Structures are given as structure tokens and as C-alpha cells.
């Protein structure tokens, strides 16, 4: 869920409920682009980095760091870092779709 409290699932449901059918990128589209996930926790820190490799070989990264070492949990750090990396795919794919539509005369 985003900082606005309006997450992908809610957005998808609203789009479908309103019958909006224009070209768009869906959460499923993003997920199909991801071919590999790499994680690294820097020793002695709470910093977790996720690198998502996309079908075309492009890599996007996200990170997470607990302020307090007592609150560090690697599984949670991985989830937050992955979400941050995945979030970076949206604008890139949106740009590619808009460019494709533009070239088609839309």
C-alpha cells in the first residue's frame, strides 16, 4: 500500500469497476517483467538492498534500513527493499507505453 493508503489492488479494482479500458500498465505487467531478484544486507548495518533484474537486462534497486538495530529483521527489510525497487518500474514502463502510443499517432 502506498503512503496515501490507496494501494495497487484498490486502484485496480476501481479501474475495473469504472470500466476504464485504455492502454495501461497493470501490476501483473510489472511482475512479468521481473526475471531475477538479488538481495544484500551490508554486514554490520541494517541496510538491505534489493536489485530486480528485468527481462531486458535492466536493473532497478530499492533499499531499506532500520533506524534501530533492535528493530532490524532481514525478511521485513527484503520486503520493503523489493517494494521500493518494484515501485521504480512504474514510471519507466509508463514512459515506454506513452512513447509507443505517441509513435502510433495517439
Describe the role of every protein-language-model region.
Residues 1-106:
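Domain-level marker for long, solvent-exposed, non-transmembrane regions
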Amino acid at each position: 500500500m502506498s503512503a496515501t493508503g490507496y494501494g495497487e489492488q484498490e486502484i485496480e479494482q476501481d479501474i475495473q469497476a469504472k470500466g476504464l479500458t485504455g492502454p495501461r500498465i497493470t501490476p501483473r505487467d510489472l511482475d512479468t517483467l521481473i526475471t531475477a531478484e538479488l538481495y544484500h544486507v551490508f554486514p554490520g548495518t541494517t541496510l538491505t538492498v534489493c536489485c530486480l533484474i528485468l527481462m531486458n537486462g535492466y536493473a532497478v534497486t530499492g533499499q531499506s534500513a532500520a533506524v534501530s538495530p533492535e528493530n532490524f529483521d532481514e525478511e521485513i527489510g527484503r520486503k520493503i527493499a523489493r517494494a521500493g525497487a518494484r515501485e521504480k518500474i512504474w514510471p519507466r514502463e509508463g514512459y515506454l507505453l506513452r512513447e509507443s502510443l505517441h509513435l502510433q499517432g495517439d
